[in-house]
């Protein structure tokens, strides 16, 4: 019995000690935006989101820093990402533009990101680069609530 207790304590000790705690790197380019945007999918403006794979862009007066890209990724799941390119300080060129299944940064470096995952598609070298900033989406019937 004592051997069993010692073994359990030993296993617990190494399990706790072997956990790696890494803090995610905060994006230094984009400030935090606070908002809560209700979207009614029955409205004509948002009806493209009723079909899987479709995306729309909301202007920044509704939420986000420069706006919000919203995509229906299927199975009643939606993803929402910041329009500002995450690898630039907000400027006149640092918006991303929807083009099919990706969004492209308008600055000269031409970063491209997936609208389904937010991942940078043309990552090169070992430089620290950021994926799109994702916002939370809650679905209730035909309503979407996008918030941060």
Where are these regions (language model features)?
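Short hydrophobic/aromatic-rich motifs at helix boundaries and adjacent loops
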Residues: 19-20, 107
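C-terminal motif of bacterial Sec signal peptides marking the signal peptidase cleavage site
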Residues: 14-18
């Amino acid at each position: 019995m004592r051997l069993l207790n010692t073994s359990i304590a030993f296993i617990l000790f190494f399990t706790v000690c072997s956990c790696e705690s890494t803090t995610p790197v905060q994006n230094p380019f984009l400030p935090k935006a606070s908002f809560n945007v209700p979207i009614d999918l029955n409205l004509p403006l948002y009806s493209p989101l009723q079909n899987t794979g479709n995306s729309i862009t909301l202007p920044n007066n509704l939420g986000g820093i420069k706006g919000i890209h919203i995509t229906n990724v299927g199975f009643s799941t939606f993803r929402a990402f910041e329009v500002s390119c995450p690898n630039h300080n907000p400027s006149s060129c640092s918006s991303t533009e929807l083009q099919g299944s990706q969004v492209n940064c308008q600055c000269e470096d031409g970063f491209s990101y997936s609208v389904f995952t937010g991942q940078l598609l043309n990552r090169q070298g070992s430089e620290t680069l950021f994926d799109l900033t994702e916002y939370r989406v809650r679905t209730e019937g035909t309503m979407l609530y996008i918030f941060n």
